[in-house]
Amino acid sequence: FNSNMLRGSVCEEDVSLMTSIDNMIEEIDFYEKEIYKGSHSGGVIKGMDYDLEDDENDEDEMTEQMVEEVADHITQDMIDEVAHHVLDNITHDMAHMEEIVHGLSGDVTQIKEIVQKVNVAVEKVKHIVETEETQKTVEPEQIEETQNTVEPEQTEETQKTVEPEQTEETQNTVEPEQIEETQKTVEPEQTEEAQKTVEPEQTEETQKTVEPEQTEETQKTVEPEQTEETQKTVEPEQTEETQKTVEPEQTEETQKTVEPEQTEETQKTVEPEQTEETQNTVEPEPTQETQNTVEP
């Protein structure tokens, strides 16, 4: 058994122990050789050979056992040292790895914050771009709507703000036909008030300016039969009285029924504005009253 095979992987203490064992084995071999070479009695030596062989076998077994024990001890120590060294390295590496992981986690959080900021900035840019696009697309529509909505308002305001001079000029330039139509469309309340406020002189003139044709027709439409019957049945005395009483009434009526020549002259002298107003405001009631008063 050669113990030099283990020297490459054994510590110094184990190496010194193994060298001492080798020295002991060499000494034993040396003494054996000298014993066999010496001039001692061969019988004693031969008798002892059997014992020596047994002792050598025992020594070999002992050495083998010792070597095995030493090897086991050395290997166990080596295993323990290696394991301890490995564990130390592992623990150191783990601690270092924890620091590295902690640093990496901090870096990751910073990266996440940066990414969030970038996303927010991108969203803001997108929003700005969208608003600009919508403003570009909406501006012409709003302009058209505002023009459509502002035009009638401006027209109304301009109509209201028309200078009164222009309105007066337009009123002066209105055709007489429109004036007559407006006079005809005057409300009945105003016509009634105007009729009430008409001076009595004008009413007399209007009565005088009543068409002579109507008065003549009313006189002609008086029933001749009634007049003849009344004249026949009335006594002569009553006829005289009735003639006396009727004469002033008829004279008044005849005054109203002045010849058409005079009425035409009076109509010519009447102002055209008053004639138009009076013709429009004349009610049918005075004609009926005149018809009633004309009857005998």
From Swiss-Prot:
Record-annotated membrane-spanning stretches: none
Polar residues biased stretches: 277-296
Positions annotated as Sequence repeat: 132-143, 144-155, 156-167, 168-179, 180-191, 192-203, 204-215, 216-227, 228-239, 240-251, 252-263, 264-275, 276-287, 288-293
Region Disordered, residue ranges: 133-296
Region of interest: 13.5 X 12 AA approximate tandem repeats of E-E-T-Q-K-T-V-E-P-E-Q-T: 132-296
UniProt keywords, alphabetically: Malaria, Repeat
Biased composition (Basic and acidic residues): 181-271
Disulphide-bonded residues: none
Domain of life: Eukaryota
Protein name: 110 kDa antigen
Record lineage: Eukaryota, Sar, Alveolata, Apicomplexa, Aconoidasida
